[in-house]
Swiss-Prot record:
This is HTH-type transcriptional repressor NanR. Pfam families: FCD (PF07729), GntR (PF00392). HAMAP family: HTH_NanR (MF_01236). Residues 1-22 are annotated as: Disordered. Keywords: DNA-binding, Repressor, Transcription, Transcription regulation. One of its GO terms (biological process) is positive regulation of protein-containing complex assembly. Homodimer. Might also form higher-order oligomers. SUPFAM superfamilies: GntR ligand-binding domain-like, Winged helix' DNA-binding domain.
Length: 263
């Protein structure tokens, strides 16, 4: 029996004993593209197509599943969003391994929508505080001399960028990225990058002078964090980090209040 015929041959038990209080309503049928997507995903997960291997051509998939080209293309696009295939112009889809970035990226739309709701930014800032608090404690306990040197280099770039707001923001993100790299967990890195991207995108536009004052405060707080990590003092590193992020949160909240009053 062909694949699509197998889908179509499924029967439903019409016994009245099922859910006496349920109202009669038709069940939504899956789109052909969703059925093709699910079958291809299972084939990939069963290693019928290995990592780096190309899938059959669109024409071959159309014949195999007995569907049209749009259904095949929609299915492949969905697999690409999941990180299961790569699609380059003029080439057949190639099986790939989902990365932590792919997994977190799937949440991006929902996260940005959540940030736009009342209290959304505060919730994400709290998440960042809990997350980075664990990172600095780990760094203070386990960071190698080489990793501490990388933090010091990031701090130096931070210092050199104080008079350039755009450069300072980049160096600020890089400083916290080095912290996230210390445990060596790619999921931590993906979460950290996404969190900062989402929060920075939600920040209001402020004057260069206001940002310059904020940059100097942040830089001094970064120094305190690195000093505590260098002394391998997790409690002090945690206190310095929490003081820093609470200050950042309060500052950007004040910026937002000022911006709203001017509107």
């Amino acid at each position: 029996m062909g694949l699509m015929n197998a889908f179509d041959s499924q029967t439903e038990d019409s016994s009245p004993a099922i859910g006496r209080n349920l109202r009669s309503r038709p069940l939504a049928r899956k789109k052909l593209s969703e059925m093709v997507e699910e079958e291809l995903e299972q084939m990939i997960r069963r290693r019928e197509f290995g990592e780096g291997e190309q899938l059959p051509s669109e024409r071959e998939l159309m014949a195999f599943f007995n569907v049209g080209r749009p259904s095949v293309r929609e299915a492949l696009a969905a697999l690409k969003r999941k990180g299961l295939v790569q699609i380059n112009n003029g080439e057949r889809a190639r099986v790939s391994r989902p990365s932590a970035d792919t997994i977190i990226g799937e949440l991006s739309g929902m996260a940005k929508d959540f940030l736009s709701h009342p209290g959304g930014i505060a919730h994400f800032e709290q998440l960042r505080l809990f997350f980075e608090s664990s990172l600095v404690r780990y760094a203070a306990e386990h960071a190698t001399d080489e990793q501490i040197d990388l933090l010091a280099k990031a701090l130096e770039i931070n210092s050199q960028s104080l008079d350039n707001n755009a450069a300072f923001i980049r160096s600020d993100v890089d400083f916290h990225r080095v912290l996230a790299e210390i445990p060596g967990n790619p999921i931590f890195m993906a979460i950290h990058v996404a969190l900062l991207d989402w929060l920075i995108a939600a920040r209001p536009t402020v004057t260069d002078q206001a940002l310059h004052e904020h940059n100097n405060v942040s830089y001094q707080q970064h120094i305190a964090i690195v000093d505590a990590i260098r002394r391998h003092d997790p409690d002090e590193a945690d206190r310095a980090l929490q003081s820093h992020l609470n200050s950042v949160s309060a500052t950007w909240h004040a910026f937002g209040q000022t911006t709203n009053k001017k509107k």
